[in-house]
Amino acid sequence: MSRLMLGRTLERICKAVLLLCLVHFLIMMILYFDVYSQRFDIFSRFNNGRGANTSRWPHHSYYNYSRPNATFPSYLPASELLPPSGKPELNRSQPTPKPIPPCPEVPPGLVGRLLIEFSSLMSMERVQRENPNVTEGGKYTPPDCRAKQKVAIIIPFRHREHHLKYWLHYLHPILRRQKIDYGIYIINQLGEDTFNRAKLLNVGYTEALKDAEYDCFIFSDVDLIPMDDRNLYHCYDQPRHFAIAMDKFGFRLPYAGYFGGVSGLSKKQFLKINGFPNEYWGWGGEDDDIYNRITLNGMKVSRPDVRIGRYRMIKHERDEHNEPNPQRFNKIQNTKNTMRKDGISSLTYRLVSIKKYPLYTNISVAIGKPPPRPIRG
């Protein structure tokens, strides 16, 4: 009897264990097929979307961009890991970029005294290779600081291509070291009539302002190269005379009222003197007229130290059709009477073309002819 009871008990236990195993097996199968179908569905969607986005998602690594240390199952599709925009979420509290500081009064990269020579051959291609940061039209803006002024450098010009190559070769690096925000404008007088330097400078002022909002204007002859980069090409509280010590004059100022070669005026100063005279045809006199305009309007000429304001001149013969102006002495004596009616307010010219080259902007103009000289009886 006891054996029969024991056998039935064992039979029930075995059936219970078998039933539990069967239940466990069924649960495992259900879970297995559920996960398999989910994975199949996910990979199907992933592969369907992959064909259109292969170039965008070439790898199978996925990350939580807002939580770098979190992990996810490798089978999750990119659409479930990325935000709705389809792009990684960036930190919305991005740091505000620091404002560009003002350029220092004395830039730290200046060299000082320079060796200037004109014996080596020069080409525009070489100058362009040397100045890759100069943009079209001969413009440059310091990348690491904010210049106080925007400077237009204006050169009166005719038949001086050889000199221009050397000028650009030396001046572009100097101006960049000086942290000048500048543009270079070559004002080319067309035709073979008598040259008029001051009128071309007026044209340069007018045309440069059409191109950009300049507040400082440097007027330079194309044959003068500064020998010291501490001679800073920007405007000052008073009209500035830069070329005070040329090799042509033994590195001395030829006379107290000399204002030739290279000079600079702010826009306000330029307008105060009504610009430059338009009636000085031929060589000489216009610089002295400009000096008179400055002093007659209550301003003074500022100059650098004579050891810094040194210049070398590229030697050349006097240009044809730029003979000395025989009327210059009479005109200089009448500056007070003529400066209000002869200047930027009375400027007339015909603009022929504007061409922007890699190293400068060329502006070709027709400025007319000088009036006929009076016949002496």
Describe each PLM feature range.
Residues 143-144, 148, 155-166, 190-192:
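Active-site beta-to-alpha loop of glycosyltransferases that engages the nucleotide-sugar donor
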Residues 180-191:
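Short beta-strand/loop segment that forms part of the nucleotide-sugar
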Residues 149-155, 171, 183-185, 204:
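Hydrophobic targeting segments
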